Amino acid sequence: MAGIVGYGAYIPKYRIKVEEIARVWNKDPESIKKGLLVYEKAVPSLDEDTATIAVEAARNALKRAEIDPKDIGAVYVGSESHPYAVKPTATIVAEAIDATPDLTAADLEFACKAGTAGIQMCMGLVESGLIKYGLAIGADTAQGAPGDALEYTAAAGGAAYIIGKSNVIAEFNGTYSYTTDTPDFWRREGKPYPRHGGRFTGEPAYFRHVINAAKGLMEKMGTKPEDYDYCVFHQPNGKFYIRVAKILGFKEEQYKIGLLTPYIGNTYSGAVPLGLSNVLDNCEGGERILAVSYGSGAGSDAFDITVTDRINKVKDKAPKTAYYLERKEYIDYAIYAKFRKKIKM
């Protein structure tokens, strides 16, 4: 089957702590941190958006893939925060990495799983022989209304994956999706901030879809949790991630490397791609990964992945995810509000 030829991450350097947001709204930061298992989040600068994040991640993926960008036959950017309502982010990325003009490109939307949907689309095109390589990116600059619970977690970041058949660093053994019409989270056209169903986003939405997708794939592959060295799940907060991992039977040593939300917040479409990139940074050949995304509305994509020995040849050819996790500068709420354009004149 098709596999990952190159991967790359990008996280903005600015951070705001839960304590700073809670101070402004006169909330108890300790109860928020305990309830969400989130301590700080990544904030995009004034000159950063989904397009710039996607370009940086794509360039890092190309460094590891060591391919001619002209051989990329498809570019898909999954996000719920594309900078233009009518103007594709994917064409900006394709032009920036010198992949144009002989390719197809499109923007994808499915809440937080649009990036993994792009990976599946690239897998199909590569497997069919229609393209040699495909580039799938999950990136977001998520927003939460001032004072809303989402403001403590809605963050920015993304990761890119080049899919192909030759010189793969990780092989896709299989994929499985679970999808229903579940309105747990939404944003109307023209509205700046999303609305959500509060606790309804848990059991009937996130947990139902992630668990069923994971179980469906393991049944399809004939595997059990102990057959995997690592697992990565969508992470709207740290609590949901750990709980779903334990429900499915995974242990801390399997899930901890993919858990990034406590330190950068929920990067939405970038969440599973970034968690997976950190796992790949720490993998060895022969190790196996289960990755399961989730997008409100609602659906989950699950992937069974086996890492090849080539991983050690490419890990250090681009900045690792840990570099972006450690590269940070703290800002206060005033700067955060300025960067995120929360002050309307």
From Swiss-Prot:
Protein name, entry field: Hydroxymethylglutaryl-CoA synthase
Keywords: Acyltransferase, Isoprene biosynthesis, Transferase
Enzyme Commission number: 2.3.3.10
Catalytic activity: acetoacetyl-CoA + acetyl-CoA + H2O = (3S)-3-hydroxy-3-methylglutaryl-CoA + CoA + H(+)
Pfam families in the cross-refs: ACP_syn_III_C (PF08541)
GO molecular function terms noted in the UniProt entry: acetyl-CoA C-acetyltransferase activity; hydroxymethylglutaryl-CoA synthase activity
N-terminal signal peptide: none
NCBIfam families documented for this protein: HMG_CoA_syn_Arc, PRK04262.1
Annotated catalytic residues: E80 (proton donor/acceptor), C112 (acyl-thioester intermediate), H234 (proton donor/acceptor)
Residues the entry annotates as binding (3S)-3-hydroxy-3-methylglutaryl-CoA: D28, C112, T153, T201, H234, R243, N266, S296
GO term, biological process aspect, one: farnesyl diphosphate biosynthetic process, mevalonate pathway
Pathway membership: Metabolic intermediate biosynthesis; (R)-mevalonate biosynthesis; (R)-mevalonate from acetyl-CoA: step 2/3
Function field: Catalyzes the condensation of acetyl-CoA with acetoacetyl-CoA to form 3-hydroxy-3-methylglutaryl-CoA (HMG-CoA). Functions in the mevalonate (MVA) pathway leading to isopentenyl diphosphate (IPP), a key precursor for the biosynthesis of isoprenoid compounds that are building blocks of archaeal membrane lipids.
Residues reported in the UniProt entry to bind CoA: R199, K239
Assembly behavior: Interacts with acetoacetyl-CoA thiolase that catalyzes the precedent step in the pathway and with a DUF35 protein. The acetoacetyl-CoA thiolase/HMG-CoA synthase complex channels the intermediate via a fused CoA-binding site, which allows for efficient coupling of the endergonic thiolase reaction with the exergonic HMGCS reaction.
Family recorded in the similarity comment: Belongs to the thiolase-like superfamily. Archaeal HMG-CoA synthase family.
Enzyme class: transferase
